[in-house]
Regions:
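Long, charged, mostly alpha-helical binding arms that flank functional sites
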Residues: 253-330
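N-terminal catalytic cores of NTP/NDP-binding nucleotidyl/phosphoryl-transfer enzymes
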Residues: 6-15, 19-82, 197-230
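Conserved short loop/turn motifs at secondary-structure junctions
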Residues: 31-35, 63-71, 94-103, 126-127, ...
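Substrate/cofactor-recognition hotspot
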Residues: 309-553
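A glycine-rich helix N-cap at a beta->alpha junction
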Residues: 76-103, 108-109, 116-119
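Active-site cores that bind ATP or allylic diphosphates and position pyrophosphate for catalysis
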Residues: 66-68, 74, 111-273, 327, ...
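Secondary-structure transition/capping motifs at alpha-helix termini
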Residues: 19-22, 51-59, 85-92, 220, ...
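Intrinsically disordered or highly flexible coil/loop and linker segments, enriched in small
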Residues: 23, 118, 166, 183, ...
Length: 553
């Protein structure tokens, strides 16, 4: 039985079926089509199917729904495998390919033909739409080819397989109910002709089963008991059940639907995401601004944060829009505890300590993680020299109100080091400050002044002689519109792209201990946010999330 920590309407259904002895094993599957990269919405489907199977001690399959050869490819297969491995969603039931069942699907199609439950149709796609009517009250009418004999249909279907006909010249349709209010039941197409090479089967096939026909067959063959999918397939459930009943004569697999995960300021449509990639609007499917799992991974998100976010967003029957800041808040809480601290000056200006020896270098011990809950008391040594880099924004000649950092004549603490007082500045011919001069109170090493005077603030720094150069990329939301599902149907989604979705900072200065950092490492750059080395470009750091946000969990 589902415990209170993981209980929802889906587990209620499963609990009832288990209690009544209808099933012995809970067996689920995640069936992505390998025609694009998985995204944060896919993570919800993975989470539900994987977690439910694990919760009941059952089985979880990964099945590639590769029944449409037009856009499918091994690149997407490999990315999906990598994503599931990264998420830790091990398919303990096995990894399968829908294309491996093509022969079985074909045999089941012939069975329906022989039983008079399927027929070969010559109507074009446009003609078929006209004949089927619509769900607004326009009645359907039978195709002129609906009453072909099983023998004629079987002959034509076998000739379709043999490649005698062109794409679209003929289809195989299930004979169900032309008067059904559900359009999916009005003699749906279950096979079409496509003279396209398949990424696994090559040119062996030129007819391919439709998803609504292949999917229930694949579920039944694999022993799936609960086919859990997103809400857009709810109207397809009667067809799913028709296939299961007519070919297998049993109640299970059972299809049930849950609401999709929609997130603010992004799009989930593979068509839209592919357009962004193909038009070079983004840096590939794994661009850190993309909602793809590979993009989130490159950005620095963790598998734990994604699954926690999905769980907190909830499992319901009603579509909802979840604020992206909720995911950021989940990750921020994790990184606050786990990320080691490092110093990085993103927009540097030079600070010269005039009373510090030019040939001297000393090291200060700075904590790796001062968070009390982290139980990390380790430190690292950071070099201190006469010339330092500080943030340009930490100095003002004419400070704004309540400014507590460095100004002419004021005193601040250099984090973990000395108190310094600004004595002057150097400017270029345009009047821009290029260097700041200060004097250090050398009696305040790692401590407070003996006279107890108050300092205005604390700023971070790195040594000019002991630092790394880096490029830093600060990411923001990809789209300006929060709910991209609400834009007008005739609108171009690209018109809503955020022109400020990334800010690139050249010439950032990082403490030298980061020389061994690698992609997948995550750091808090003190006072600047959480960052990770980019996995594509050496010497580039991506901001994962800011230090703070007004959003509260």
């Amino acid at each position: 039985m589902a415990d209170e920590k993981f209980s929802n309407f889906l587990t209620d259904i499963i609990d009832a079926d288990l209690a009544e002895g209808k099933v012995d094993v809970v067996h689920t599957r995640f069936p992505p089509e390998p025609n694009g990269y998985l995204h944060i919405g896919s993570a919800k489907a993975i989470f539900i199917n994987y977690t439910i199977a694990k919760h009941y001690g059952g089985l979880f399959n990964l099945r590639f729904d590769d029944t449409n050869p037009a856009r499918e490819g091994d690149e997407y297969v490999q990315s999906i495998l990598q994503d599931l491995k990264w998420l830790g969603a091990e398919p303990n039931g096995g990894i399968f390919y829908g294309s491996d069942y093509f022969e079985r699907c074909y045999e089941y199609a012939e069975q329906l033909i022989k039983e008079g439950k399927a027929y070969v149709d010559d109507l074009t796609r446009e003609e078929m739409q006209e004949y089927r009517g619509n769900d607004a009250g326009k009645p359907s009418r039978p195709s002129p080819y609906r009453d072909r004999t099983p023998e004629e249909n079987l002959d034509l279907f076998r000739r379709m397989r043999a490649g005698e006909f062109a794409d679209g010249e003929k289809t195989l349709r299930a004979r169900i109910d032309l008067a059904s209010p559900n359009m999916n039941m009005r003699d749906p197409t279950i096979y079409r002709i496509k003279h396209v090479e398949h990424h696994r089967q090559g040119d062996k096939w030129c007819i391919y089963p439709m998803y609504d026909f292949a999917h229930p067959i694949q579920d039944a063959i694999e022993g799936i008991t609960f086919s859990l999918c997103s809400l857009e397939f709810e109207n397809h459930r009667p067809l799913y059940e028709w296939v299961i009943t007519n070919l297998f004569g049993k109640e299970f697999p059972k299809q049930r639907e849950f609401a999709r995960l929609n997130v603010t300021n992004t799009v989930m449509s593979k068509r839209y995401l592919r357009e962004l990639v193909e038009k070079n609007i983004v840096d590939g499917w794994d661009d850190p601004r993309m909602p793809t799992l590979s993009g989130l991974r490159r950005r620095g998100y963790t598998p734990t944060s994604i699954f926690t976010f999905v769980k907190e967003a909830g499992i319901s029957k009603a579509d909802n829009l979840v604020d992206m800041r909720q995911l950021e808040a989940v990750l921020r809480a994790e990184l606050e505890l786990n990320a080691q601290r490092r110093v990085a000056v993103l927009e540097p200006v030079k600070l010269i300590i005039d009373n510090y020896p030019a040939d001297q270098c000393e090291y200060f011990d700075l904590p790796n993680n001062p968070n009390r809950d982290a139980n990390d008391t380790t430190t690292r040594k950071v070099a201190f020299t006469k010339e330092l880099w500080i943030e340009n924004s930490d100095f003002f000649e004419v400070p704004p109100p309540k400014f507590k950092r460095l100004t002419l004549g004021s005193e601040v603490r250099l984090m973990g080091a000395y108190l310094v007082r600004c004595t002057g500045v150097d400017k270029d011919e345009n009047g821009k400050v290029v260097a700041i001069h200060a004097e250090a109170d050398l009696e305040t090493r790692n401590g407070n002044p003996a006279d107890g005077r108050k300092v205005r603030g604390t700023i971070h720094w790195v040594s000019c002689a002991h630092c790394l150069d880096a490029e830093v990329e600060l990411y923001d939301k990809l789209f300006t519109e929060a709910n991209m599902n609400s834009i007008p149907d005739d609108a171009d989604f690209k018109d809503y792209l955020n022109p400020d979705s990334v800010k690139v900072l050249q010439g950032a200065k990082l403490e030298e201990s980061l020389k061994d950092a690698k992609p997948g490492d995550r750091f808090q750059f003190v006072r600047n946010g959480y960052f990770t080395p980019d996995s594509k470009h050496e010497g580039v750091y991506n901001r994962i999330v800011t230090l703070k946000d007004s959003f509260k969990l």
